[in-house]
């Protein structure tokens, strides 16, 4: 009889509600053992693993559980404490560690948590390695336990934040500062709550902080990259030059210009791509974007001579395409920006610094930089669902999709997909007229909600 291997990994690691399967202490111990087992399979001997986390209350128990699993298998753990996900990727490389683990559910509510695993090079592990970890966990076959004298040690890296701060600052040109810029910064009460203000302040910006007082249960709570209205209002109130909103683990960014208008990942990607092309350092004059990228943005990129490779949604898919096609810039509308010249994963702070550098070098406001980009009207509605039933098996949903596509003709498009990290169905409609796409998106969302949902998320 074949034993079933239960999938643990989604599109961005293991994720779920804390103290519910799969995010339990028991599972975390097993995952720690499995990571150790994979490392031993790849290269027998002593190994070191970096462990970081965001500010969720449950991070403490998962941190200890992972360390227990790892050290029981002879792994030395280097504990960073609260630090952005890109900080874990950076320090994994800097310490020549064999792997890195980030305990975070990214933009999800505080009651969720997750585990992201990085290779020694700072890249998220491959599907093959994920399947091997799942196999080890399912069969509890991790290899031989070491003798009592060979279990691993646990060390705290006391200057982890400082190291990442200096790394981030080093991506900004020497001799330049942010002097004269007033920045509204929202850290979502998350992993970047200390490092992000320090980076911008040490570069001599005036920083007005929001979302920098984590309690363990307020991460992403009506703040951060998913709720840019906070910094929209604050930028106007404080007459700031720019607003920067990060998510709970600091790997994505949404910006706001001096007029209080949102500058999303599509716009940030376009600004940075055009700048790198002008400097002659955009590899192959190509970037990687996703199926969610606005058509107007794609048209702008085409007009300035930049080829855009389209990947599925998810920073892992973006990165895979970047590596395959040797691109050094890629990103998503949601705010994941990957600058491979600097880091191996999305990095909100580094992305912000690149936009600020362009503003300073060109003596432009953020609204000046985005003014040539005319986005197509687009509507995005999120529907919370009870379970992710294959959408192509739902006749009413498929009928609605056919009707909407017929209404749009060749002048628009519709995308319907499940989130890879939450029980959410995303409805995206793009077309020529705002009122039309809003109406059509709501039509589909209402039908999805009636078939599967527990409510439309405002």
UniProtKB/Swiss-Prot annotation:
GO biological process, one term: carbohydrate metabolic process
Its biological purpose: Catalyzes the conversion of glucosamine-6-phosphate to glucosamine-1-phosphate.
InterPro entries linked to this entry: A-D-PHexomutase_a/b/a-I, A-D-PHexomutase_a/b/a-I/II/III, A-D-PHexomutase_a/b/a-II, A-D-PHexomutase_a/b/a-III, A-D-PHexomutase_C, A-D-PHexomutase_C_sf, A-D-PHexomutase_CS, Alpha-D-phosphohexomutase_SF
One Pfam short name: PGM_PMM_III
Post-translational modifications: Activated by phosphorylation.
Key words, A-Z: Isomerase, Magnesium, Metal-binding, Phosphoprotein
The species this protein was found in: Chlamydia felis (strain Fe/C-56)
EC number(s) given by UniProt: 5.4.2.10
Binding-site residues for Mg(2+), renumbered to this chain: 106, 247, 249, 251
Highest taxon in the source lineage: Bacteria
Cofactor(s) needed: Mg(2+)
GO MF annotation: an example: phosphomannomutase activity
Family of this protein: Belongs to the phosphohexose mutase family.
Protein name: Phosphoglucosamine mutase
Catalytic activity: alpha-D-glucosamine 1-phosphate = D-glucosamine 6-phosphate
Enzyme class: isomerase
